[in-house]
């Protein structure tokens, strides 16, 4: 049986949400028309995404198409129905949400989360901001087919829907999943059939998803993709994967830009960074113990996160004064840098070896670190395939025990604050349906 059914108003949206789940290892298919045999396809795919091509049609026709699609998939008894909406709220939002609620019955509750943090869409105070600009001040207001002239999400939905619309602010989300659970229950008790929620980060989306799950309500996810991705984790069984779909980031750069980039990754993905004790890596008496500690911590969090990372600093105050440290250890600054890079590389090797293929791709930042990682993995080099952003290359390791492992290498002063997110997103997409030669 299909566990997740996505109903989108256009093909691009159907694919965009589907790929978020596909890259987690779930078997996903998009259908241009209703599947002739929904039950058969439900057995073949974990996720079925259907496009109704209804964004620019009359509201009554949009309602009919979505209702037909939802009704056709009811026999699959999916654990989650999703109404995929445009990230700039174009189209027949109200009629299509109404159609879903009418088909799924009076117990269903539409939870609208319009945020898409990795695409610059956040909702705060009920307002949708696109790269910090109010929605109505963006080009979507001049869209020739489906312009949007408002920014308040609840108002946009309420103007089109026959159902009562509630709102849960960011302040509640920041209190945690229990607060979200209680707020959703209160909205349902108050007779709301649609609830709009704020979210500014991936962590917020995860919190909302967990709260929705804890509520036990029959939630219909209404969003451009990321909320569905987060909520599906509570519906779908963990996929069986021959090789891992996780990314390991090994970051030696200590620049302010790098710290901004890593913070953006933490906000966008389920991420766990471990900060090394660089003094321990430098000290030959403590080096092995620190490598074991950090690699163990990374491995402990492997099952719970999509992106794992090892870094040398978290805050500006942790940046080493190489000259004074070199003087204290009576070695050169170059040797200090080399010991740190070698320590990071040893941690990466240990994680890859012990995780037994759970890590599907590498991201390295800092030239010394990239060289050290290649050497630690006995790779003779990187087969370069593409440029992700200027001065950030995607390729595959050449030789060694991890031959052909996907890798992105980037300098510490490369790109804007979103550059690391772009690289991680690229790498996750590349490895989502990756196949590897038998070992």
UniProtKB/Swiss-Prot annotation:
Entries under InterPro entries matching the protein: 4-carb_acid_sugar_kinase_N, 4-carb_acid_sugar_kinase_N_sf, NBD_C, NBD_C_sf
Enzyme class: transferase
Gene3D superfamilies given in the database record: Four-carbon acid sugar kinase, nucleotide binding domain, Putative sugar-binding, N-terminal domain
Swiss-Prot/TrEMBL keywords: ATP-binding, Carbohydrate metabolism, Kinase, Nucleotide-binding, Transferase
Catalytic activity as recorded in UniProt: D-erythronate + ATP = 4-phospho-D-erythronate + ADP + H(+)
UniProt binding sites for ATP: 253, 366-369, 412
Regions that span the bilayer: none
GO molecular function: ATP binding; kinase activity
EC number, UniProt record: 2.7.1.220
Known role: Catalyzes the ATP-dependent phosphorylation of D-erythronate to D-erythronate 4-phosphate. Can also phosphorylate D-threonate and 4-hydroxy-L-threonine, with lower efficiency.
Similarity section: Belongs to the four-carbon acid sugar kinase family.
Protein name (Swiss-Prot/TrEMBL): D-erythronate kinase
Organism expressing this protein natively: Heliobacterium modesticaldum (strain ATCC 51547 / Ice1)
Lineage, top ranks: Bacteria, Bacillati, Bacillota, Clostridia, Eubacteriales
């Amino acid at each position: 049986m299909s566990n997740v059914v996505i109903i989108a108003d256009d093909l691009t949206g159907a694919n965009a949400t589907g790929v978020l789940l596909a890259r987690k290892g779930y078997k996903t298919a998009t259908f241009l028309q209703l599947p002739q045999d929904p039950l058969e396809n439900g057995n073949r795919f974990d996720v079925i995404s259907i496009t109704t091509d209804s964004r620019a049609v009359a509201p009554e026709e949009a309602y009919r198409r979505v209702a037909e699609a939802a009704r056709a998939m009811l026999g699959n008894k999916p654990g989650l129905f999703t109404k995929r909406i445009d990230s700039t709220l174009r189209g027949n939002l109200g009629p299509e949400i109404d159609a879903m609620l009418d088909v799924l019955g009076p117990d269903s509750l539409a939870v609208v989360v319009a945020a898409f943090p990795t695409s610059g869409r956040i909702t705060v105070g009920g307002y949708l901001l696109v790269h910090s600009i109010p929605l109505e001040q963006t080009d979507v207001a001049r869209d020739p087919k489906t312009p949007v002239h408002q920014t308040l999400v609840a108002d946009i939905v309420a103007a089109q829907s026959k159902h009562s619309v509630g709102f849960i602010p960011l302040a509640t989300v920041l209190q945690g999943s229990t607060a979200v659970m209680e707020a959703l229950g209160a909205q349902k008790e108050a007779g709301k059939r649609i609830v709009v929620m704020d979210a500014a980060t991936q962590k917020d989306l995860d919190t909302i998803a967990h709260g929705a799950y804890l509520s036990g309500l029959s939630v219909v996810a209404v969003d451009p993709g990321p909320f569905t991705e987060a909520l599906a984790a509570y519906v779908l069984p963990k996929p069986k994967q021959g090789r891992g779909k996780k990314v390991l980031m090994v970051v030696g750069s200590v620049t302010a830009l790098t710290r901004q980039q890593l913070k953006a990754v933490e906000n966008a993905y389920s991420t766990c960074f471990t900060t090394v004790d660089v003094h321990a890596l430098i000290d030959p008496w403590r080096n092995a113990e620190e490598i074991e500690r950090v690699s163990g911590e990374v491995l402990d969090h492997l099952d719970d996160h999509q992106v794992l990372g090892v870094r040398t600093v978290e805050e500006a105050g942790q940046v080493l004064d190489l000259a004074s440290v070199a003087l204290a250890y009576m070695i050169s600054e170059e040797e200090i840098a080399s010991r740190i890079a070698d320590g990071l590389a040893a941690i990466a090797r240990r994680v890859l070896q012990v995780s037994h293929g759970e890590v599907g791709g590498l991201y390295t930042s800092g030239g010394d670190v990239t060289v050290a990682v290649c050497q630690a993995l006995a790779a003779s080099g990187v087969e370069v395939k593409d440029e992700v952003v200027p001065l950030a290359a995607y390729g595959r390791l050449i030789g060694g025990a991890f031959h052909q492992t996907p890798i992105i290498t980037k300098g510490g002063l490369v790109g804007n604050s979103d550059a690391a997110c772009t690289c991680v997103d690229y790498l996750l997409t590349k490895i989502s349906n990756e196949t590897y030669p038998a070992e």
